[in-house]
From Swiss-Prot:
Gene responsible for this protein: queC
Superkingdom field: Bacteria
Phylogenetic placement of the source organism: Bacteria, Pseudomonadati, Thermodesulfobacteriota, Desulfuromonadia, Geobacterales
Gene Ontology BP term (one): queuosine biosynthetic process
Cofactor(s) needed by this chain: Zn(2+)
Function field: Catalyzes the ATP-dependent conversion of 7-carboxy-7-deazaguanine (CDG) to 7-cyano-7-deazaguanine (preQ(0)).
Binding site for Zn(2+): 188, 198, 201, 204
Catalytic activity, reaction form: 7-carboxy-7-deazaguanine + NH4(+) + ATP = 7-cyano-7-deazaguanine + ADP + phosphate + H2O + H(+)
Keyword ATP-binding (UniProt): yes
Protein name: 7-cyano-7-deazaguanine synthase
Pfam families to which the protein is assigned, alphabetical: QueC
């Protein structure tokens, strides 16, 4: 019987590659997306359109509103920085977001009798978010196996991070080798009303850098600067 895996799937470059990797590894992918009040709602439209064509057995969209808490340029009126990737944790960091996302994934995994979760975090070409680091994932996996019925019964739950040590260029090359169509992904934090990527936020800059280093043209549409 094919093993199930819950895939955290935003509709972005990394999570789409992650879904393709899980499928290649023989898992039946269950895609999990979140509408949490993010200003870049375009990613959800992409996720809804492409989860099943990408091979997801099911696609669950969970809705909650982190705008009530604020604290991030992605969930409040704070301006999205456009001056480049800096050294400090940027204002686009959403407090505890991956902890929240993984908790929903953990709950759905238990319901599905599933012991594998995939998340597309990356610790090389990234914005410096603390919940994208290997130490965080390791600690969360330890907690998950202490806090669940499956873990207590010895059915070890594993959090897979296949992109954690890859550059953005390597992620793109991996995805292309698996047939990922990157025109059907969205990365921009501050897109135009027509969906065009800004080309200047951290996420756009990292994406463009990755495509340039991979020697591939980015197929998404950008605003004319």
């Amino acid at each position: 019987m094919q093993k199930k895996a819950v895939i955290l799937y935003s509709g972005g470059l990394d999570s789409t590659t992650c879904l393709a990797i899980a499928k290649k590894q023989g898992f039946a992918p269950y895609a999990l997306s979140f509408s949490y009040g993010q200003r870049h709602q375009q990613e959800l439209e992409v996720a809804k359109l492409n989860a099943r064509p990408m091979g997801a057995v099911d696609h669950l969209l969970v809705e909650f509103d982190l705008r009530k808490m604020g604290g991030s340029a992605l969930t409040s009126d704070i301006e999205v920085p456009k001056e480049g990737v800096g050294e400090e944790i940027p204002v686009t960091y959403v407090p505890a977001r991956n902890t929240i996302f993984l908790s929903f994934a953990l709950g759905w995994a238990e319901t599905l009798d599933c012991f594998d979760i995939f998340i597309g975090v990356n610790a090389l070409d990234y914005s410096g978010y603390p919940d994208c680091r290997p130490e965080f994932i390791s600690a969360y996996e330890t907690m998950a196996n202490l806090a669940t019925k499956a873990g207590v019964e010895g059915k070890r739950l594993q959090i897979h991070t296949p992109l954690i040590s890859l550059t953005k260029a390597e992620i793109i090359q991996k995805g292309i080798s698996l047939g990922v169509d990157y025109s059907k992904t969205h990365s921009c934090y501050d897109p135009a009303e027509d969906g065009a990527a800004c080309g200047r936020c951290d996420s756009c800059r990292l994406r463009l850098k990755g495509f340039a280093e991979a020697g591939v043209t980015d197929p998404v549409r950008y605003q004319k600067l």
